[in-house]
Each structure stands twice: as C-alpha cells, then as structure tokens.
C-alpha cells in the first residue's frame, strides 16, 4: 500500500552505486563545472529510465529506484512494478530476514521501498524492519551491518520492533555506539582491520549525520572529515582500494551534504580549484552514464549513484532541480 510521497532526506542518498557501461568520457565545457554537472545529471537520468524494470538486488535494483526517485524520474508504473517484485521476493524468502547472514539485504530493500513510496514495515504482511532487531545479526556483517541498518531505519523514522527472546535488542543509541567503536586510529572507517577506506568513511558519516550534534559523534565526525580532506586527490577526486573511481567521489559528496557541508565550496574539499563534484564528473560519459574508473568498464551495471550525488551538490551550487 502506498503511504507517502516519494521523498527521502538528502543525507540518505549515499546508497546508490555509480557503476555503468558508457562511451567516451564527457569533457567540462564551463570553468565552474556547472554545465557538466547538469548534463551528466540529465543524460544519466535518461539512461536509467531506458533500462529494464528494477529487480531486487544491488545491480539494477534498489540503487536505481532510489536514484530515480531522488531525481523525480521514477514513474508510478516503475514504482508499482518494483513493489510487486519485492512482495514476491519477500514471500519466497519466507522470513523477516531476506538473507541468513547479510542484514544489508533488508536495509537496502527498506531504502528502495521507502524511496518508491511504500511502507517497508508492511510488505505482503511482513515487517522488513523486524529483520534488523538483533544487534548480533547486524554485527556479524562487520562495519556494513550497523551502518546500513541505521540509515535504513532513519530513512522514514521507522520504529524498531522488539527482538525475539535470546536476541540483543537493536536501538538507535546502540547502533551509533557500535559505529563509533569501529572508527580507526587515523579517523576513518574500514571495511575490516584498521586501515581506513574512503567509501566506508563516507558511509559511516552519512549514517551518523542525524546525530552529529551529540558530543561524541561530533568529535568522530570532525576527525573523519580531516581524514577525507587529506585523502582527496589533487583533481578533487578520491581513491578506494588503490584506484581513483566514481563511487568514492559520490559517496563523499553525499556524506558531506548529509552533514550540511557544501562539497563544491568548502575549502577543505577544494583542491587546486577542483571539488568532489569535478572529480565525479571526470567519469561522466557522453550520452549518459558513468564509468567506474579510467581502467575499468563494467557493462553489466547501471549508473545509479549519480542522482543523489549530483542532486546533493547541485542543491548547494549553481544547478537547479
């Protein structure tokens, strides 16, 4: 049942992965990058709209729904088709947990449904938030589990149901504390170990953004922002796992806007006149879409991180929505 308009907080939109097949990289045609951002935004929106109906899954699924919704390009027909696909998937799963070990399956689907305008707490009679009630289950997926659970639960202020007997009750306070406990000594967050990664740091900041006024959270955020500023490349972009790529730029843009920071103007994130938006648009392709990196082309994936990243940046810069 549709229960609300398709809108999500800008900070939420860290979710979408920017991966696509594309042709020739587009080139900036205005010094401030405004026209490049606008063209990349519009062309990639058209590209995504032309793809097949979204499924349940990381590729061609929730990230596409979220991106199209944020860009106000998600049609009623596509939203309804996606919701029905999720209903069928949930019925087949036969559990409030969509995966026995990956809580992010629930988190991602909650985000997709909410973006499409549906109540994730009632999907064919199943409350998908009930799959996130056990902290031990979330913790089993490492850093990702608590981060995405908090983002999903906060995306529409979902109540957290009571956990089953013998489980460790999930609370927002507990999730924040868990995420803070993962912060590395250099100020960032890592997928594993103590060597920080730009993507994980940006995701953690996005999840913590609604709590940034709390003293311990603010201290962690300030340290992480210093880490990200130091990690930024001379062209405004970012690297992850040893390679400059579009996803890292997009993740940072969304994290900054979630925190109320203008990624196009904040001096900490403008290097040699180039911002993260310039870094992102360096991967834009003529005709729509973004490539993963200069070396890697991924024909099986669709560009779905562009709408939140460029929309968030444009909202604080020269482009209009």
List the predicted regions and their residue ranges.
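Bacterial N-terminal signal peptides that target proteins for export
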Residues: 1-12
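Preference for long, amphipathic alpha-helical scaffolds in soluble/luminal domains
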Residues: 2-4, 22-321
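Bacterial N-terminal signal peptides
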Residues: 11-20
């Amino acid at each position: 049942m549709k229960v609300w308009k398709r809108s999500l907080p800008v900070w939420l939109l860290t979710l979408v992965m920017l991966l696509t097949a594309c042709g020739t990289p587009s080139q900036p045609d205005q010094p401030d990058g405004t026209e490049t951002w606008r063209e990349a935004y519009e062309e990639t929106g058209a590209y995504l709209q032309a793809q097949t109906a979204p499924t349940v899954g990381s590729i061609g699924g929730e990230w596409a729904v979220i991106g199209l919704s944020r860009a106000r390009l998600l049609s009623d027909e596509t939203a309804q088709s996606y919701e029905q696909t999720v209903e069928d998937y949930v019925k087949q799963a036969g559990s409030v947990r969509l995966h026995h070990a990956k809580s992010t399956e629930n988190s991602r689907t909650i985000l997709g449904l909410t973006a499409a305008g549906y109540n994730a707490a009632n999907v064919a009679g199943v409350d998908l938030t009930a799959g996130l009630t056990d902290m031990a289950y979330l913790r089993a997926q490492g850093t990702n589990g608590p981060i995405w659970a908090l983002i999903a639960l906060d995306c529409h202020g979902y109540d957290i149901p009571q956990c089953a007997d013998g489980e460790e009750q999930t609370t927002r306070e507990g999730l924040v504390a868990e995420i803070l406990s993962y912060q590395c000594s250099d100020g960032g967050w890592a997928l594993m170990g103590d060597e920080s990664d730009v993507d994980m740091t940006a995701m953690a900041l996005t999840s913590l953004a609604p709590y940034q006024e709390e003293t311990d959270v603010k201290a962690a955020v300030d340290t992480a922002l210093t880490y990200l500023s130091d990690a930024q490349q001379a062209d405004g972009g970012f690297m992850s796992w040893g390679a400059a790529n579009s996803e890292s730029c997009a993740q940072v843009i969304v994290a900054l806007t979630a925190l109320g920071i203008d990624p196009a103007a904040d001096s900490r994130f403008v290097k040699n006149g180039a911002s993260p938006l310039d870094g992102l648009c360096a991967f834009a392709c003529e005709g729509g879409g973004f490539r993963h990196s200069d070396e890697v082309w991924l024909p099986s994936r669709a560009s779905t991180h562009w709408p939140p990243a460029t929309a968030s940046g444009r909202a604080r810069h020269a482009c209009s929505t």
